[in-house]
Amino acid sequence: MSHQQRHDRYTAALALLGSPEAIIRLGGALALVELADDWLTDETDPQEHGRRKAQTIITTLCAYICSPFQLAHDYERLMGDQPQGLTPQQARRFRAEKTELAAEAQVRGRILTEIHDRVHWEPSDGGQPATNTAPDPEKVTAGLWSHLRFDFSGAVFFYPVDFTQSYWGAGANLRGCTYRDQARFTRSIYGADALFDRSVYHGEAFLSDSVYRAGAGLSECVWGADARLVGCVYEGNVNLSACTWEGAAYLSDCTYYGYTYLADSVYRGDADFWQSTFYGTANLEHCTYYRGARFEDSIYHSAAYLGDSVFRRTANLAFTVYWGAAHFGGCVFAGQAWLDNSVWFGGADFSGVKFKKKTDFEEARLLGAADFSGASFARVPAFTDGVFNAAAENLFEVSAKSKQPLPLAGGIPQGARALTATERQVLTERLQAAGAGRETNAREFEQPRSELIRWVRYEVAGTPDEAEADSAG
């Protein structure tokens, strides 16, 4: 087919896309989809030329999806039952508007389906894709349109969005979107920046098991229902700050390789960050958690900033490892605070923290400088079988307004013990081998870091009496 014939097809399809009839608009959209496929699969035409022509079509389809549709503003009214007490004329108008909204939703939903079919990835080996795990981008075959650019910014999706298992090789722009129904992006791969900032999700959001190979922008979003971002891999920087989570926020089992910005957010439902791994600096300051907050069994390879946050109910930060400085200064734990069995290799800053209920540091390892200056406790904190580094610059002078003291024995919290001289020497050597305390790629030190964690947890243990015996021996 000649270029002129394809140009004529493009012009005709655009005319159909502007029809007042929904079924004709759909025909125009499908004609454009077919034409884009023709450009990309024509082996007689230079590849770059076909790609440019296909990109023009994609841009047109995205512009249609983003174009305003007046009745979408009345989504809730038109999706409900016909109101009582309408006049016959009002009832006819309601039914007509409801039908028109449904027809346009079908057109736009079908366009998204056609796009999804062409950015959908499949395993390179021809097998079935694994579920409940992020895909390996090197072991998938991208879709025909995966290398093209998609800009849906500002779109109002008044119909379900399903981009499950998609490969966005040039990234995707979904900034400022509104999702009136469910949004599904599970097991997606983003080869360039993925932009979801300033979006509103009225329905459930599914973004789990996805891989972000460049930057990920999800800041200033409102998640109106449960949101699932479990098991994601962020290879670049990620911005999830200034979000409002109205439902449960599931962000467990994620891996963050770059700078992670999760500050200034409000969690009105449960917040779950269980088993997260942060390689770069993690900033989670100035957050408010209205329900349970789970951070246990996580690893921070660089500095962790969680200060000036409010935990209104139980906060579980147990079994967590901090390789860099950990900042909790100014936090308020209104519910129980579980920090037991955690390890701080760098400084642990709890200055000015208010612990208003039970506080558990049992079997914790605070091996850098521990700062509890100005902290306040409603109950005596538990440090049973904990371990401190007495050679560090520890500060234990609590606030004068604290209802309970921080009982000390031998200069450290009662129930805990100090590292022996031998343990301090071994710790220093192993920290150096693990690349701690300097700018480094923590991924290169996985084995020595894992070995050091095991040593600290299972060999640097025991009661104060046992430590004294070890020192004497």
Question: Where is each model-derived feature located?
Answer:
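N-terminal leader/targeting and pre-domain segments
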Residues: 8-15, 20-33, 38-473
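Transmembrane signal-anchor/signal-peptide helices with a preference for the extracytoplasmic
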Residues: 1-5
